[in-house]
């Protein structure tokens, strides 16, 4: 009977807060700041607790201390004349906040979250009432002892970190940790040590998973994207990928080539590179791009069932005249220097290119940090998740024009809806974990690349990825990528209801939660669609998208009061 009663007590507790983030794209500072403040949940708690008993500036001070305790303590010490008095007041305030954020959880769960060094003391403080005079005196004795023994700083830091942890019960990353930004490896380090989280893989995550599995076309794409945005930190410092062979090859091959169209987008670079280094990055960018097109052609030829023959474009170049011939029309090329391409056999890798990609392949396969992070992605991730009447997936659900599920052939079978996401999930795992040398492994490896750019891939769902056209052709119409029907039909409530039913998610409070497509506020777009059945929360963390969206994106918080959509604004530094 006592066990039943205990279960009922746990069930009757307020709902733990869920935090949804998506499309972080390597922006680790913004990511860590949003984690620290729980998208405003900490501020809301502080306002609830102290109300009008504190001035706004005082409440802001408490919040800043909770977010960045080490930094804030240094500022306080330089300012305060009576530090012990500040310690006494602040520790009492932090105890109240900690009591509030821990009240949703059982004592057992809270105890498991406590820092070992201060576990007993924090338990005493959390479970004593400050209203009763005797208890209030007891709390003050504990706090005074902390101060007199010179442990106040350490204790404040421990309390602030505990508040951060208890404010969020579970974290959902709805895809795209990787790409563009300089700190995907730092984000993964944070997640590997996070107390409760899950990941719904995004297209950029899958690309990195393909690279870590040994797909050379994925490896080339990963490097190309890094060069495009001059973000080499994740590759070199994060994962120890040796780019020296690529640098040497690029300098030799394109020594007299300005490679103008391959100049990186410096607005989003991870450092201030000098002219010589930028020149080298530009050459490396061109070298790996040409290699990528050749490697992708190998997969396209090997897998005609992918239906991607129209993405083999090098053979449509008239190298003598410097034009691209497509569907009877000619387009002048923006770059006509191709020293590694044989016009008679344009997709054949030169001996030097093959040797280069073999070296880079080995570097990816031997990176221990990359292996650790990929294991984390596989352990805590998947193509979709159903949680508390919410269906989470990063990008798309392939649909026909009439809203029915699109049947996608994989191997000898067709898959659609939930079955399609389950099958692609299984293939991504097979590509990484299965032994080399089997046809199953070989097909899965190729399919991971298809998940990056294939027309019927739920992580992509466009008619093409116009990489070649964007680089070499100045025609916007030719570079246009047409999205699948999902991206327009998802505005209809009946379509969203059909998708939810496919995953056995029912009820008036069920939702689909997506990322992938930035919500362009400045163009009047809304994150809430289909009469509230679909929420698009592309985090907009990526600085590359912020000029287009007008904001730094959205996050979502789901607490005992309901769903709360949080608007993020840009800032020179999150700490500001």
Residue ranges of model-derived segments:
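Extended, H/D-rich, highly charged conserved domains that either
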Residues: 299, 304-336, 363-468
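Non-catalytic, alpha-helical, charged scaffold/linker segments
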Residues: 51-93, 232-340
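Conserved beta-sheet core of the metallophosphoesterase superfamily
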Residues: 186-192, 196-199, 214-227, 406-416, ...
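Low-complexity, serine/threonine/proline-enriched polar segments
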Residues: 62-113, 237-262, 422-480
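Low-complexity, highly charged intrinsically disordered N-terminal segments
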Residues: 79-160
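Single conserved hydrophobic/aromatic residue that forms the stacking wall/gate
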Residues: 1-5, 569-576
